[in-house]
Amino acid sequence: MENHRGFLGSIHRLPFVPKRNLRKDGNHLLEHLYVSLWRDMEKRRYPKRKPLVSNLLHDREAVMLYSPTGVGKTWLSLSIALIAAGRGSLDLLDWRNDEAQPVCYVDGEMLEEDIQERIRLLIPSLGVDENLLRKNFSFVSRVSQPDSNEDFLSLDMEQHQWDLLKWIRDNTRKNSHPIVILDNLSNLVEL
């Protein structure tokens, strides 16, 4: 048992040194990571996570949909957004939301009028409260920006990351958990 404790103690003291991702000033991006040992972690009590869309999405979660083009990722993510923002449901998958949440849907490839058409088609089948949807659903489209706006959201730019975090902060209120949907990631990062 003594060897076991010594082994854990030595792990706790090991520094984390990434092999890449150096900042411009030469320091590692991840040099100050918080590390939890099981002996500490097992004692912690975490707050119960709130379902935002039952059986699918909870607060403090990240979800990524991945599949080839043309299989319906936008339809699916838009349905999730509408259920969350408009207190809707999809009985087939047992998805529902009893408390409307603010949603920012950022689209990198579709025209706003195409999304409008999809939303109009989805509203009746999802039982969305349209008044809540009007209040809680924000949509940002890359291709619907005016020509004068050359600087669309690009997640590899630090200022744009801060802008997105500001939206989250501005839309966080008691019992609300802002949801950001990025559709699709490859169009929102300059490669």
Please tell me what each predicted stretch does:
Residues M1-L29:
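Short, small/acidic-rich helices and loops at N termini and domain boundaries
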